[in-house]
């Protein structure tokens, strides 16, 4: 049995899609009857852990360092040569059309995973007309797939509004052994030359417009001392201010987990996430979360943090201040418990394989070693 993922959103620099695919690769590697290949423009062919295949592509402005194929034909030929039994497309560009073309020729199922809220992202940048165009495009594309998965109920609802009524809720998961409160080290404040009483906030991810980091920086500056913001990642240039510390992206997940666990509160100001994996990673490390909405709101509730109005500096600042007047230890323990009970990869991956199993048919059931689906749609 050969499963192939193709996406322009897989890269060594990490991100939610990369974490998902790397975890899938490790999971499938323990099942000797299964082969798994990741095809992406952002890798070199030849790696075997995971197995990677390069898709010829060029840098594309506005997609933050990722590369995009110039045609559908070349990636479709590469997919056909891999002879998969199932293809999953992790973006809505040429890779998705290539997956459809190869799947039709091979007479195999094609799955789409909706990792990026394209209409809303384009609306933020180009307005309502671009949003309508993206919505029409996605509807035309995704109706041709045998299955469409979305990581949050909000995204399932949005796809239904586009006319894709059969989309299924398939959340992502967390490595609870890597992301855990035990990663905390008490010397982080001293290492950053901060006072012991500093209230340490953290954001990790790409520095892009849709993450709304300017909003977060303004809120932290409005709060003043003793608040300090740790920004982990890279991308667009952001202001250098005394209350902000920048740390480059951490490819090593254990290093990222140590940083997360050593802070007080995760703050996520963006409202365009389809899931919010970094928020879940922080929760697994025992951090309460202040968030603004979108799919992240499905992870955060009154027992694990606070939700504030999106696009409001005042609301974000008030929420950050308010959470420090609550029991942070209790909120963090609740956050960890929620991650354990609902989002362990050991629960999520069998659910995903059950989705695949339904497409492949009972004759190949033994090949997938699928478990029951426990996620309610």
Each language-model region and where it sits:
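Donor nucleotide-sugar binding/catalytic pocket of nucleotide-sugar-dependent glycosyltransferases
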Residues: 136-185
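N-terminal subdomain of nucleotide-sugar transferases
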Residues: 1-54, 221, 374-377
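Conserved donor-binding/catalytic core segment of Leloir-type glycosyltransferases
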Residues: 4, 195-211, 217-220
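Conserved acidic donor-binding segment of nucleotide-sugar-dependent glycosyltransferases
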Residues: 249, 302-313, 321-327
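Short hydrophobic beta-strand element within catalytic cores of glycosyltransferases
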Residues: 288-291
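Nucleotide-activated donor-binding/catalytic signature segment of Leloir-type glycosyltransferases, i.e.
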Residues: 237-254
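Aromatic "clamp/platform" in nucleotide-sugar-dependent glycosyltransferases that forms part
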Residues: 271
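Short alpha-helical donor nucleotide-sugar binding micro-motif in glycosyltransferases
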Residues: 79, 142, 258-263
